[in-house]
């Protein structure tokens, strides 16, 4: 999507991959059910179907990455994105120390099939790192994502 930084795309892709269990680039109803249940939620079949219909804008029965991005932008715009932001941060913060380090970012990018130089990783961190400590804390992540939401929604 236009206006997204590399960091924002990484965060969204990582979240998408959590849902896309078989790695085919699409989220099926079954994958949506599995992930929501793994988060401790127990949606009914009707609730799952409603969620799928809300996101699956082209009606083909699966959620692709663009539809997923649209959902995230909508959720953030609706003001209920705080929980989603927290979850996305936790996905990227592999060691759960409250920071996204260059090593964690490199690991995520590698898992997404992106080979990055140390300089590219450092640049991504620098763009979001407002306090200059060399890593991204949750507050910096929230600012970065809110800025992305404004760019997405215009």
From Swiss-Prot:
Record keyword Secreted present: no
Organism lineage: Eukaryota, Viridiplantae, Streptophyta, Embryophyta, Tracheophyta
Sequence positions that bind Ca(2+) 2: 56, 58, 60, 67
TM segment ranges: none
Record-listed N6,N6,N6-trimethyllysine modification sites: 115
Binding residues annotated for Ca(2+) 3, in chain numbering: 93, 95, 97, 104
GO molecular function: calcium ion binding; enzyme regulator activity
Ranges for domain EF-hand: 7-42, 43-78, 80-115, 116-151
This protein's encoding gene: CML4
Keyword annotations: Calcium, Metal-binding, Methylation, Repeat
Residues the record lists as binding Ca(2+) 1: 20, 22, 24, 26, 31
PROSITE patterns: EF_HAND_1 (PS00018), EF_HAND_2 (PS50222)
Protein name, UniProt field: Calmodulin-like protein 4
Family label: Belongs to the calmodulin family.
């Amino acid at each position: 999507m236009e206006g997204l930084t590399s960091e924002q795309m990484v965060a969204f892709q990582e979240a998408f991959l959590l849902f896309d269990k078989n790695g085919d680039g699409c989220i099926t109803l079954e994958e949506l059910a599995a992930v929501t249940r793994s988060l401790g939620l127990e949606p009914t079949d009707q609730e799952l179907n409603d969620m799928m219909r809300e996101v699956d804008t082209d009606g083909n029965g699966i959620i692709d990455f663009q539809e997923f991005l649209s959902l995230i932008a909508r959720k953030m715009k609706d003001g209920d994105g705080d929980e989603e932001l927290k979850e996305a941060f936790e996905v990227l913060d592999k060691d759960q120390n409250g920071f996204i380090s260059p090593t964690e970012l490199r690991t995520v990018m590698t898992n997404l099939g992106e080979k990055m130089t140390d300089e590219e990783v450092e640049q991504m961190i620098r763009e979001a790192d407002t306090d200059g400590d060399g890593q991204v804390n949750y507050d910096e992540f929230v600012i970065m994502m809110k800025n992305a939401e404004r760019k997405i929604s215009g």
